[in-house]
Regions:
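N-terminal transmembrane-helix/juxtamembrane module of multi-pass inner/ER membrane proteins
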Residues: 1-63, 96-123
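Interfacial segments of alpha-helical transmembrane regions
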Residues: 7-15, 66-97
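Aromatic-anchored segments of alpha-helical transmembrane domains
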Residues: 22-26, 86-95, 162-174
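Hydrophobic alpha-helical transmembrane segments
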Residues: 23-27, 55-74, 135-139, 146-150, 168-172
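Membrane-water interface at transmembrane helix exits
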Residues: 36, 71, 92-100, 147, ...
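Membrane-helix interface segments
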Residues: 46-47, 74-78, 151-157
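Membrane-embedded catalytic cores of phosphoryl/pyrophosphoryl-handling enzymes
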Residues: 114-214
């Protein structure tokens, strides 16, 4: 069933797999500091304006709002989306608070560095609980779910682009390392697939025309 979902939603999962491979190889051949500097040096005024807003697409409040909007059309679809949010958030929170509670964010890690990092003025940047990225976890869970629910499967790449940009924003804004966003994306995507597998038949029974396509 998992392979069937991946095959049906190829427009999302194929480019996502390629993204995982490319970024994974980069992490094997470069340090997190090098990757951070690579992203940081590629800053621009337009990006400084864009990413502080784009990053809110990974905020839990935004996820809940989308769940409520989905519930207006189909209550069970809304509940399934919320279950994805709950599972992905729970996994991310447990890792942050109990397993990797001492993980430092870039600001704290490089506070004595001689390298002049570009940091957007007025931005509230955190220092602790870096791994994994909660925003990236939530946004991949959300847009992964939207890709699965969309009957026009060819648009899956669109949801992936939005999710990837939101994840990239966490590194650009100096809130997370690449590895934080990388693992967060996996947690979010896997959580959505698990919830979808467990609940899509239940959703289909409620209103056949709103049945998630597998």
């Amino acid at each position: 069933m998992v392979f069937r979902i991946i095959r049906t939603n190829y427009a999302f999962f194929l480019p996502y797999l390629l993204l995982l491979i490319v970024v994974g190889v980069l992490q094997l051949t470069r340090s997190q500091e090098q990757l951070m500097q690579w992203v940081n040096v590629r800053n621009a005024p337009a990006a400084d304006e864009f990413f502080p807003y784009a990053t809110y697409l990974g905020d839990g409040v935004f996820f809940v709002i989308v769940c409520l909007l989905l519930a207006i059309n189909n209550r069970r679809i809304g509940l399934m989306a919320f279950a994805s949010f709950a599972l992905s958030s729970l996994v991310s929170l447990c890792l942050k608070q109990f397993v990797f509670s001492n993980s430092l964010r870039p600001l704290k890690t490089f506070e004595h560095s001689t390298y002049q990092y570009h940091i957007i003025k007025g931005l509230d940047i955190h220092s602790y609980n870096s791994f994994p990225s909660g925003h990236t976890t939530s946004d991949f869970a959300l847009f992964g779910m939207l890709a699965l629910l969309d009957e026009r499967k060819g648009r899956g790449w669109f949801f992936l682009v939005i999710a990837a940009l939101t994840g990239y924003s966490r590194v650009y804004l100096f809130q997370h390392f690449v590895e934080d966003a990388y693992v967060g994306s996996i947690i979010g995507t896997v959580s959505t697939v698990v919830v979808y597998l467990l609940m899509y038949r239940w959703v289909a029974q409620y209103q056949k025309k709103d049945r998630p396509t597998v």
